[in-house]
Amino acid sequence: MTAPLPGMEEIEDPAVVREEMISAFEDASKDLASNTSYYDAERRPEAIGVTVPREMQQLLAHVGYPRLYVDSVAERQAVEGFRLGDADEADEELWQWWQANNLDIEAPLGYTDAYVHGRSFITISKPDPQLDLGWDQNVPIIRVEPPTRMHAEIDPRINRVSKAIRVAYDKEGNEIQAATLYTPMETIGWFRADGEWAEWFNVPHGLGVVPVVPLPNRTRLSDLYGTSEITPELRSMTDAAARILMLMQATAELMGVPQRLIFGIKPEEIGVDSETGQTLFDAYLARILAFEDAEGKIQQFSAAELANFTNALDQIAKQVAAYTGLPPQYLSTAADNPASAEAIRAAESRLIKKVERKNLMFGGAWEEAMRIAYRIMKGGDVPPDMLRMETVWRDPSTPTYAAKADAATKLYGNGQGVIPRERARIDMGYSVKEREEMRRWDEEEAAMGLGLLGTMVDADPTVPGSPSPTAPPKPQPAIESSGGDA
């Protein structure tokens, strides 16, 4: 008897596997609440210690370092297309699939979940005319799922998902009311009816691979499931900043205004009820205290200095910048003088390099997802050029429009530089459609004789029906006759 290949083991009882995967999902979800609390800057009383009085705990501040860091990375990631093999432009069909699934909105949210929890997931399925009403049957359904709703097991022998489960909770978020099991050969769905599981659908896709692709925030080769970007050192700095802000507020409440000592007067003269001791007006904050007793004296303590707290917060912000690579101006620790454009780019270099590395990891996941989507919709194996697919990302740096234009102009050099006109337009960030329109305008100008022959009006394979005009023949020198006319 031949043993099954790794990742292709037969599932005898899907219901048993469903229960095992739901249990694994619940175990993997235990630590997600802590990640969420840091990202959402929720109150965490355990972060301020047991010696702090209960009344003082109300002053605990919400510190948003984790959200600032995660959002600063995720907001710089934007997919612009998928290029196949040696193609010059992005593939139009794959981009239509991307747009039809609203992935320009959903994908960045998936990146945020991957940074907060260490992972998120991409699911691919073929539309069902009975279930997916109103959906284009020629477009695959591609969804991004958070780890709070999905779990996948990765087989280390093949470094690929062996099975996955997606769950849906009830309105209260207490009980799972639906589950979908993804296997290499079929996708099975269940829902709860009267407390019992009932089969919802069964799709035998026969792909040989699980139609689930993880988006792991990996930091090492051995890290198959991903690691949260909210690292222990970032958590400790967040808690320290919350404690310092709490102490600063308490100090401002108690000693921020100078304390006064008054001698030789009756309490009634400054508005204190002799029976209850209740202050009738706020003598603590009053600027002028007047009383009739000539023997009365008043003295004042110095107000508490809060500079030590602000200095401590500045040091914590510098530690956060060192751990995360965030530019100082993101943490409000920059100098009063505005930085130059070169200084800003230099400060962002670590952040940009981090985003570029994340783009490579997530780009590989999207390429695998698109290959699975192609197999689901077209059948058979993927063509060779799809094996060399490349995800096209927007430039994660932040050059100004004028700086990009200046660089592109100098590199193009009016046709004499190191890059052609089309490369300059790509560097400027124009989309595929915009560049096609520009090429058509170039052709129109060439037809009117505006001097662009031989540059952009040559045959362009990326523009269907592009004309191939030829330059007018050069004038030939006149041929002198050897003899005179009779």
Swiss-Prot record:
Describe its partners and assembly state.
Homododecamer.
Q: tRNA-binding as a keyword?
A: no
Q: Does the keyword DNA repair apply?
A: no
Q: Where is the composition biased (Pro residues)?
A: 464-476
- The entry's keywords: Capsid protein, Viral capsid assembly, Viral genome ejection through host cell envelope, Viral genome packaging, Viral long flexible tail ejection system, Viral penetration into host cytoplasm, Viral release from host cell, Virion, Virus entry into host cell
GO annotation (BP), single: symbiont genome ejection through host cell envelope, long flexible tail mechanism
Q: Which parts of the chain span the membrane according to its record?
A: none
Localization per Swiss-Prot or TrEMBL: Virion
| Annotated spans, Disordered | 456-486
Protein's recorded name: Portal protein
Q: State a single Pfam family of this protein.
A: SPP1_portal
Q: Which InterPro entries does the annotation name? A: Portal_protein_SPP1_Gp6-like
Gene Ontology terms: cellular component: viral capsid
Explain the purpose of this protein. Forms the portal vertex of the capsid. This portal plays critical roles in head assembly, genome packaging, neck/tail attachment, and genome ejection. The portal protein multimerizes as a single ring-shaped homododecamer arranged around a central channel. Binds to the terminase subunits to form the packaging machine.
Superkingdom of the source? Viruses
Q: Spell out the family assignment given in the record's similarity comment.
A: Belongs to the SPP1-like portal protein family.
